[in-house]
Amino acid sequence: MSWFVLVIAGLFEVVWAVGLKYTHGFTRLIPSLITASAVALSMGLLAYAMKGLPIGTAYAVWTGIGAVGTAIFGIIVFGESASFARILSFALIIAGIIGLKLSS
């Protein structure tokens, strides 16, 4: 259950990270409220997941999901670079997440 909650927390991290772009420095109300809510949910779920997972593993997986998810969103939605080096780097992060899961 902790792993499932951690993945959901990571997905909410993607929501708030992407949401920051839409807040325009927190000058737009609705995107700002959505972003703030996503931050609260992400942190709350991360804290809950940490009750059943080692702190280092949980934090590394959470940031990995957020980083890769946000970068993939940027490639798909904002047309950011999808170079070989960038994709390889994402694959290494994902491999690290899988390694942490398998070693827990």
Curated annotation (Swiss-Prot):
This protein's membrane topology, according to the annotation, is:
Multi-pass membrane protein
The protein's GO terms of the molecular function aspect are: transmembrane transporter activity
Q: Which Pfam families match?
A: Multi_Drug_Res
Q: Which GO terms describe its biological process?
A: monoatomic ion transport
**Which regions face the Cytoplasmic side of the membrane?**
1, 49-54, 101-104
Alphabetical list of InterPro entries matching this protein: Small_drug/metabolite_transptr (IPR000390), Small_multidrug_res (IPR045324)
Domain of life, per lineage: Bacteria
Localization of this protein: Cell inner membrane
Give TM segment ranges.
Answer: 2-19, 29-48, 55-77, 82-100
A GO cellular component term found in this entry reads:
plasma membrane
Q: Which UniProt keywords apply?
A: Cell inner membrane, Cell membrane, Ion transport, Membrane, Transmembrane, Transmembrane helix, Transport
* Periplasmic side of membrane: 20-28, 78-81
Spell out the family assignment given in the record's similarity comment: Belongs to the drug/metabolite transporter (DMT) superfamily. Small multidrug resistance (SMR) (TC 2.A.7.1) family. Gdx/SugE subfamily.
Role according to the record: Guanidinium ion exporter. Couples guanidinium export to the proton motive force, exchanging one guanidinium ion for two protons.
Instruction: Identify this protein by name.
Output: Guanidinium exporter
User: What gene name does this entry carry?
Assistant: gdx
